[in-house]
Swiss-Prot record:
GO terms for biological process: regulation of DNA-templated transcription. One of its GO terms (cellular component) is cytosol. Keywords: Cytoplasm, DNA-binding, Transcription, Transcription regulation. This is Probable transcriptional regulatory protein EAT1b_0153. It comes from Exiguobacterium sp. (strain ATCC BAA-1283 / AT1b). One of its GO terms (molecular function) is DNA binding. Belongs to the TACO1 family. YeeN subfamily.
Amino acid sequence: MGRKWNNIKEKKASKDANTSRVYAKFGREIYVAARQGEPDPELNQSLKFVVERAKTYNVPRAIIDRAIDKAKGGDEENFDELRYEGFGPNGSMVIVDTLTNNVNRTASEVRAAFGKNGGNMGVSGSVAYMFDATAVIGVNEMSADDVLELMMEHDLDVRDVIEEDETVIVYAEPEAFHAVQTAFKAAGVEEFAVAELTMLPQNEVSLDDASQEQFEKLIDVLEDLEDVRQVYHNVEM
């Protein structure tokens, strides 16, 4: 599958270690998910997913509860979920998912990030067809064999099970996300190392050193934008 999930999380964690950026982004996602349905994770699958994902990034419970409480109140801040697609150095492919209360601002900032870092915006669908929507769930307490057996016991047809360092990663269809988590919880798993709904590239590309440096700067700039939720790409890191 090509993604080193622990490496990706460590990079993000180190970048956000001394800031509240990651908390603010999750607070916004949780608020929007709670507004779109019941403000109870057990009754709202979208909210449950965001909360589970937030836990893997060590978002404090107080931040999660505050966002849900805000959604319960009369505050009605409207957000749009928008996806942008584009190209980085040497034809590399990038997808940017955003959550914004100002579409014009977000479009301008994303376009500028591409343009100033060796890339350019594409039209809708220009790169997404080269990615597959995928649920990615990782645990530390079980072996790959035990996970495979667990998936079979619960009659879950997953795409792949891969051991990475001390983490076992399950790749599945997006709609199987909660079923896979439920199976793990039934087996006694309380914490997840990875809990993502992501876009995985069908093929990854390698860049020369100069292009790689420029590409990584592009990704950093995009991820630093306030309205950006997730950035997906097809470059080996």
